Amino acid sequence: MSSDASLRVVVRARPMNGRETKEGASRCVQFYENTKQIVINESATFTFDAVFADTSDQESVYETTALPLLDRIFAGFNATVLAYGQTGSGKTYTMGTEDNVGTDEMRRGIIPRLVSALFQRIMNTEAPESFAVTVSMFEVYGDNVYDLLRPDKVKLNVHGDEKNCTVVNLTAVPVIDLKGALKQLAVGCHYRTKAETAMNAMSSRSHAVFTVFVEKTATAECDSAFSAKLQLVDLAGSERLKKTEAEGNRMKEGININGGLLILSQVIAALATKQKHIPYRNSVITRVLQDSLGGNSFTVFLACISPADSNSQETLNTLRYADRAKQIKNKPIVNKNPKAEEIAILQAQLKRLQKENADLKQGIAPAEVRFNDANNSAEILSLKEEVVRKTEQLKERAMKQSECIIRMSALTQKNSRLEEDKAKLQSMLTDVRNTVLNEEMLDAAEVVRSIQQVVGDTEESTTLADDDNDETALGGQDDTIYDTERLPELQAELDDLEKQIAMKDENRQKALDEQRAFIEAMQQRESEKTQLVVRISELETEMNKLRQEGKKVTTAAKLAEERRQKLKDLERQHAEDKKVLNDMKKLQETRRRMEETLKKTEDELKNLKTQRLRLLREQRAEASKFQAFKQKHEREMAQMKSKLQKRENDVAIQKRMTDQKLTVLQMRLTEANRANKTLRELNLKRANRKSSPTNASALQNMIEEELEHEMCAQRSHWLCEDLRRQRHDLMQNINTVESMKFEGGKRRRISASADPNVSVVIEGEEEFEVKRQKELTFLRASLETLNEEIKDSLRNETIAGNEERANSRWEKVPAEMRPAFEAVYAQAVAHIRKEIELEFKLARTKSEFTAKIASKASHEEKRKKEDEEMRAKYRELAQCLEDAKSGLHEKIAFLLCLIKENRVDENAIQQFESLKNQFCDVEQKVKKASRRKTTNFMGGLTPKPELQRNERARRAVKYYGNVVNSEDVTMDDSRHQKRKDHSLLAVEMNRTTDDNVKRRVAMSPIKCDDDTRLTEEDEDIENEAMNNATFVKDSFNSATIVLDDSQPSPSNSTFVIGAAPTSEADGVPPIKRKSRRTDLGPL
């Protein structure tokens, strides 16, 4: 890309975001970076200074676009980087407006990279202190300018003329490095107005301008001086309210942003066509960008676009604006300081005069040159003064050079002396080492003292040498450096000597410790020897005493012999008695062991009996649990089958709706194909038309063709919008199908060589996956067809919206007639657009209404099917109730007979309780099923409950015969005209009917409360107990007992089972189960 152009246009595309991918959008832009071209919708081609695809990185964009501006800034020119595009197209990311110090290097945008290169360039110059850099930042929000570097965001005024524009009282902060600049940028971004929209989570609601001022002053090394301004502009994105879904303040902000960008496009168009009047003053953003567009600046126009076809219209508009901006020509000039420029002119004149003076002295000046005497004398005097000053400077330099020579000689002498001192120190160090090695037991203090003496001598010699050369400061500095370098060597040698001395001291200390330990051991041995001598003397005394006593015992030896013989006899007799005693103890022990074995055997027998009983109880409990488990899983299987059936019904309904949508989609595709074909023919016909007609008939035909072309273009546009909406729905269906998971029963694969818990096979999963993949394939194929049709529509729409053709439409029409033709044509196009829009809205409404009707019909069908299933279930439960009642009445009659004969035990009472609970639960299920029966309410879809009074009356008559009048039970006012009147007779009739019903018969034999209803597990246990139950009968009466119908029995007899009188023979414990209220009494 050539960097000589004053305005360059660059286009960059961002990658497709998640929202566009989720909608199923496809790419509508192709990039050719080698030829710097962009093709949109396969029909329109644009060429720019540089093109960056969505795969380009930040560094390549910066190096191509912004880096060449750095040379312009240091040459004294103004520079601008301006980012333009749709909202959410990546302008802020490319510019790096939100970057800070912690941003990753790879993700940094143009602003931090360019500012960093600016400071690095300043530091590489000969005089960095001659540069002064200040930054400022402001935003244009709602056609007002606010300072972003102040917390209160002061509103500022904009002053200027046609050539220049200035923001009054704008804060300018001096910075010295990149960190300071990024800090001010972060402050400005913090106060910038941002908000969330449907297209961007952090959408910029204002235009932000970050300005860097660079000013250089002249110095002795460099006499150039200039000032430059770098403007980095991040414009707010253009947006459509339909896509951003903005409301309230967001909508007002969007309108203001679009208004400012519209004026900016008008300015670009005026500059491109080289109009005399440029509407800069129509908007604030165009006023502050006056230098950047057609003014004194090198400008880079960075257009950011989205590659998705859902944003193709916005992308096409952005590319058209960028293409217009290429035709703008800026006129940049160098911004120089007038004073610095005057100084440079005077210095050039001085050099010229000095050269002329030298030529005159040499006599080679031209003869025709004549000088003014006064001016020449003044110039000569000034030159003489300059020569004197230069001479003085040379003298000073010569004196400094002589001083340096003297110092060098002194340093040389000092170096020789130090070499001698070094030799002396080495000899002394050798003597010290020999002394230490020869005299190992030398006292450490003496060795250290001798080393200190050597070091002292060295320091003394060094001090003497310093005193000799004290008058030369440079020499003293070199001595200090030399002593500092020598000191570590001496310190290392001193450390070695100290280590050797410490080692010798340690050896000597060890020897002393060993000697001390030996002395202590000898002393301990002496004390032990003394104790042994005392002990030996004591033992000798005791031995003498024992000898004396032995002599006395000899005389009594005979008496002791007799006593010993007698003692032996007694001991023998004692041994015999002891043996007899031991035999008796053994017999007792044997008896005790036998008793313990017998007791242990009895305990084991009791334990076995107890265990047997426990096992029997556990067996019964496990059997009941297994039965409950079996019934529970059977219910779960039934529920799963019901859910599967329901799911299949939902899938069928969904498939039907999908088929309807696909049918509509196919119709739309056919219509879109027809419209695209017509539009292509019209485009070809219009392209083949060589020139605009001149006669009236030809002009009328052309206008009709143009209007027809506009109608087809608008129809194609609305068809494309409709196809996009259907593509969005299709993508939702694809996402739903992709997220579907199989729900079915599981069975484990059991093999002899593998763990049964390792692999689990899901029944029907493979069939489900195959079906899902087929559906996905079909939906994706439909999506591809939609994308192709949308691409074709966009291509035709782009061809139809060719601006060049529209501008040349009325070329052959006389100039005075063109406004009238344009006005009439614009009015006709507006009516056509409105008509097409209403037509498509009507079609969409009709389609939605048809879909709602189909949905209503499917729901109605589903409701009817559920009602039919509920009726079947109700009939099944009613039949179960009838069967249960027919069996339970016989058992209850038999049980009542047993109760009258007082032959009832606890088991019978419990079985009766189980029968009662089962009866109540069955009746509750039937009532619940009856309550769930629904009917339509006023023809709507919402089911409403219905009171089944007539049905209850019929059931009462069926169960209890004609003893109950159905009209008394139902209390149906429609059967009695008198009951509809609000009279005393009607009230009395209703009251009498109610009393009759209460007195004569109940609505059901047993009434149970909701709080006493059994759970499903308890119901299963009770059912199992009832099925396995048997009634207790006497052995002499094994036949079935039948109640005698001839015996009178009151219809409302009450049997109180829980409170029946008990006798000691019966021994029936009271029932602990919660009582139920029934017509038979409390149970």
UniProtKB/Swiss-Prot annotation:
CDD domains: KISc. Disruption phenotype: RNAi-mediated knockdown results in embryos that undergo early mitotic divisions as in wild-type, but which later then display aberrant patterns of nuclei and arrest before morphogenesis. RNAi-mediated knockdown results in chromosome segregation defects in mitotic embryos whereby chromosomes form a disordered metaphase plate and multiple chromosomes exhibit delays in segregation resulting in the formation of bridges during anaphase. The chromosome bridges stretch, break and sometimes form micronuclei. Residues 6-328 form the Kinesin motor domain. Its main location: nucleus. GO terms for molecular function: ATP binding; ATP hydrolysis activity; microtubule binding; microtubule motor activity. It comes from the Eukaryota. It is found in: Nucleus, Nucleoplasm; Nucleus; Cytoplasm, Cytoskeleton, Spindle; Chromosome. ATP binds at G85, Q86, T87, G88, S89, G90, K91, T92. Residues 458-479, 1044-1083 are annotated as: Disordered. One of its GO terms (cellular component) is kinesin complex. Residues 458-471 have a biased composition (Acidic residues). SUPFAM superfamilies: P-loop containing nucleoside triphosphate hydrolases. Keywords: ATP-binding, Cell cycle, Cell division, Chromosome, Coiled coil, Cytoplasm, Cytoskeleton, Meiosis, Mitosis, Nucleotide-binding, Nucleus. Expressed in the gonad. Residues 408-435, 487-650 form a coiled coil. GO terms for biological process: cell division; meiotic chromosome condensation; meiotic spindle midzone assembly; microtubule-based movement. Residues 1044-1055 have a biased composition (Polar residues). It holds the Pfam family Kinesin. Required for chromosome movement and orientation on spindle poles in mitosis and meiosis. May play a role in early anterior-posterior chromosome movement in mitotic embryos. Belongs to the TRAFAC class myosin-kinesin ATPase superfamily. Kinesin family. PANTHER family: CHROMOSOME-ASSOCIATED KINESIN KIF4A-RELATED (PTHR47969:SF15). This is Kinesin-like protein klp-19. The lineage of its organism: Eukaryota, Metazoa, Ecdysozoa, Nematoda, Chromadorea.
